């Protein structure tokens, strides 16, 4: 029997019904098989850039930006022999013939997706085993395939794994993981939040609602890891994932469609009207001036509605400008206006608005060190909202028309090419709905 009475209808990115009368817990990371598979694949997947390795060796461009070692050039036809290398990597990585190791060639052998077996993940203390094992296997596979001698073997290692272990990360490497090294996390349990918005956008091929959905899934699943979504707060996070992330009851789609030619303010008006109609909030009292003070019938559901309105306002505002830079101020002033309009707390009970203050400063104010797309939930500036701010950033970068110095194409080309080949990464909304359909009658 479900723990919560909430039941939702799940709609797709096109506003069409996918699954109806779904228990809220069916979209929980603890119950939904699609989310479980997605998180597992995030941890065990590595993108290897064979074309990059070949180019690094040919130019002796090793260990990162501006590093060249004349005289150490090595000519190896790596892409041409991608299939043989992939087969060798598989034999080195797998633990048995029938395990779930997965090796996939992409772009005619220019890249490889390596998914290490869950048996290796199970005996590791953290998720970096996927990058370390894959890197070591690719190095050995190239050495074996081309009979590289002991004098050039270290160049192969550096072309594959970069400066590691001289650095704590893989600076200058030609392999990428979605999760950064644990030593760079802002706090315990922040691993799933350490995926920049541009990566999410590239993986979903700039589909706005799927990008915000994937971001929401990663952010809200992290809340279960950090202990935020436990006990009294679990329902709040599940409702946030359902409505803001997965377009429950088509609320997100309806708000965007209704305000296609509107503003942040009109989205707020639509949201409050919908919340009153659905019985989420009610007028507590009316002042002599006519100002209405609202009170929620359900605090957690109000937060989910407010978060959905926040994402809708971002889509409307940034979509009108076709420039992602406005996302920070949209997150800030949507909440500011919403609080004045209703007398109720903003999204995430103030944390989203607080996050936006710092986000505005560090993304384009006096400091302006980085565009919105390079931020993530593990960033010191944007970590403070408990899963409700970053989906807006992902949506904004989908709608950007090339205004950013840190564009999706520049920062996330390899990640997008490799991970977008996995359907539940590329289209999470429909696949999570399928997962919910599998388990809803078992709850």
Curated annotation (Swiss-Prot):
Coiled coil: none annotated. One of its GO terms (biological process) is methanogenesis. Its cofactor is coenzyme F430. InterPro entries: Me_CoM_Rdtase_asu/bsu_C, Me_CoM_Rdtase_asu_N_sub2, Me_CoM_Rdtase_bsu, Me_CoM_Rdtase_bsu_C, Me_CoM_Rdtase_bsu_N, Me_CoM_Rdtase_Fd-like_fold. Its EC number is 2.8.4.1. Keywords: Methanogenesis, Transferase. Coenzyme M binds at residue 367. It catalyses: coenzyme B + methyl-coenzyme M = methane + coenzyme M-coenzyme B heterodisulfide. Pathway: One-carbon metabolism; methyl-coenzyme M reduction; methane from methyl-coenzyme M: step 1/1. Binds 2 coenzyme F430 non-covalently per MCR complex. Coenzyme F430 is a yellow nickel porphinoid. Coenzyme B binds at residue 369. The keyword Lipid metabolism does not apply. One of its GO terms (molecular function) is coenzyme-B sulfoethylthiotransferase activity. MCR is a hexamer of two alpha, two beta, and two gamma chains, forming a dimer of heterotrimers. Component of the methyl-coenzyme M reductase (MCR) I that catalyzes the reductive cleavage of methyl-coenzyme M (CoM-S-CH3 or 2-(methylthio)ethanesulfonate) using coenzyme B (CoB or 7-mercaptoheptanoylthreonine phosphate) as reductant which results in the production of methane and the mixed heterodisulfide of CoB and CoM (CoM-S-S-CoB). This is the final step in methanogenesis. Belongs to the methyl-coenzyme M reductase beta subunit family. This is Methyl-coenzyme M reductase II subunit beta. It comes from Methanothermobacter marburgensis (strain ATCC BAA-927 / DSM 2133 / JCM 14651 / NBRC 100331 / OCM 82 / Marburg). The gene is mrtB.
């Amino acid at each position: 029997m479900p723990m919560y009475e909430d039941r939702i209808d799940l709609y797709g990115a096109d506003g069409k019904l996918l699954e109806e009368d779904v228990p809220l817990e069916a979209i929980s990371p603890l119950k939904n098989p699609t989310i479980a598979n997605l998180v597992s694949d995030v941890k065990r997947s590595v993108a290897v850039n064979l074309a990059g390795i070949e180019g690094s060796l040919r130019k002796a461009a090793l260990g990162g930006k501006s590093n060249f070692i004349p005289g150490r050039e090595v000519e190896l036809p790596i892409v041409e022999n991608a299939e043989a290398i992939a087969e060798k990597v598989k034999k080195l990585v797998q633990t048995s013939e029938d395990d779930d190791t997965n090796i996939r060639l992409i772009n005619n052998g220019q890249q490889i997706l390596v998914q290490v077996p869950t048996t290796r993940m199970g005996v590791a203390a953290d998720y970096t085993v996927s990058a370390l094992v894959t890197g070591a296997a690719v190095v050995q596979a190239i050495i074996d395939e081309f009979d590289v001698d002991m004098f050039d073997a270290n160049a192969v290692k550096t072309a594959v794994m970069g400066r590691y272990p001289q650095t704590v990360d893989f600076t200058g490497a030609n392999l990428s993981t979605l999760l950064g090294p644990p030593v760079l996390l802002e706090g315990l349990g922040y691993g799933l939040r350490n995926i920049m918005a541009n990566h999410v956008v590239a993986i979903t091929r700039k589909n706005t609602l799927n990008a915000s959905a994937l971001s929401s899934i990663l952010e809200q699943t992290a809340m279960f890891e950090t202990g935020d979504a436990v006990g009294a707060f679990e329902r709040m996070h599940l409702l946030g994932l359902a409505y803001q992330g997965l377009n429950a009851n088509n609320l997100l789609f309806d708000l965007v469609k209704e305000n296609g030619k509107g503003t942040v303010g009109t989205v707020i008006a639509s949201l409050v009207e919908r919340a009153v109609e659905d019985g989420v909030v009610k007028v507590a009292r009316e002042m002599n001036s006519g100002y209405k003070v609202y009170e929620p019938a359900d605090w957690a559901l109000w937060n989910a509605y407010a978060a959905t309105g926040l994402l809708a306002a971002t889509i409307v505002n940034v979509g009108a400008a076709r420039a992602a830079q406005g996302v920070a101020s949209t997150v800030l002033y949507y909440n500011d206006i919403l609080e004045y309009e209703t007398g109720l707390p903003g999204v995430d009970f103030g944390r989203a608005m607080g996050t936006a203050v710092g986000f505005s400063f560090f993304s384009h104010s006096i400091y302006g060190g980085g565009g919105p797309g390079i931020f993530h939930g593990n960033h010191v500036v944007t970590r403070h909202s408990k899963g409700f701010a970053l989906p807006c950033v992902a949506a904004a970068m989908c709608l950007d028309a090339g205004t950013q110095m840190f564009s999706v194409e520049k920062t996330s080309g390899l990640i997008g090419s490799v991970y977008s080949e996995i359907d539940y990464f590329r289209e999470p909304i429909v696949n999570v709905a399928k997962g919910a359909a599998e388990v809803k009658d078992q709850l």
